[in-house]
Amino acid sequence: EETKALLKVHTSNYRIVGFTESVGIDELVPIAKEHEIPVVEDLGSGVLIDLEKYGLTHEPTVQESIAHGADVVCFSGDKLLGGPQAGIIIGKKKYIDMMKKNQLTRALRIDKFTAAALEMVLMEYLSEETAVQNIPVLRMIATPLEEIEKEARSFVRILRHTGMDAKIQMVSCESQIGGGSLPLERMESRAVAIQPNGMSVAEMEEKMRHLE
């Protein structure tokens, strides 16, 4: 009787594994409608495009949450969205209007510079191709392994030409998306390994800071 909303929080930056169960948003919506209460879904990372086409596991998108009937959806402006740090809330007008009337709204709202930056990022999403090209986190996710390997080899050549007394080579590695997103994902990648000879790591770091 006292329940005012059903909240589903997506585990965007962690995973619970083993004998676990979770309720899908599509299962919650009919229950909420039956009791005339809203469904709120916190997606965390705020994905707007399907990442599966870039070799990652499926991450729920904002569009999917809305299509499944969520009344309010919350997600981050940074992380996988690729914009400034901010919290974004979208949903049905009557619930958004209620939030606007809350006394905390003025204290929690973003400044004009953040709003302007967020607007520019969201405009990139008018075309998925443009978003993948211009938003750094998406561009890095979509970069083919061959291109990463090419850049790593180029970096190895540059470092070797500096005369640095070290063993420098390209190695295979696994990368994570980071930023509190897709915690179990491992992407095949390439790294440059540097093993200094006759100098400490600190000395090598200082030398590299002055490379041109």
What do the predicted segments below correspond to?
Residues K94, I110-L159, C173, P183:
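Structural motif of enzymes handling amino- and sulfur-group chemistry
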Residues P38, G44-E52, D78-G91, V132-T143, ...:
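Short, charge-rich amphipathic segments
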